[in-house]
Amino acid sequence: MNGLLLSGGSDISPEFLRQDVPDPSVLDKQIDPERDRWEFQAVQNALSRGLPILAICKGLQVFNVGLGGTLKLDIQGHNLPEQKQRDVQPLRSARGASHRFPKVNSAHHQAIDQLGDDLEVEAWAAHDGIIEQVRLRKYPFGLAVQYHPERSRIYDALFKDFFARLESTKK
């Protein structure tokens, strides 16, 4: 393994969350505990080896929870059909953000609540502050995004950066 790419998917199984789930009905019905177990272990393995990590959508949530963070288990207004394919969610970016996009195609019903250890917010939704991009401090390449960069060419720089890091780990 030269790096780790965590993709989107169903909600994290409650057994892996570091918080109470007062209303289990807000969680997806297609949770996959085996996938979750594998992903949490893969995060720990990648971190212990200093490998590049790119986490997307659910992947960001796994990355955050794996580092001790918690989630907002059901948010309103971020899972609208028009947000899935078009870049409609205005962002605010931190001054030192590694990748900046004015708008993203964010569509999800969960998000980061409490940040995991050593994560730093790089971008958040302009209208409600939902965290959309984080990076792992003092780590060669640990980037996680709530939006879907695989859906548009405007995010190519993010993938090029990740793949360049993968190539450098082969040497």
Q: Model regions: which residues?
A:
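Conserved G/P- and acidic residue-centered "switch" motifs that form tight phosphate/ATP-binding loops
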Residues: 57
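Catalytic nucleophile loop
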Residues: 60
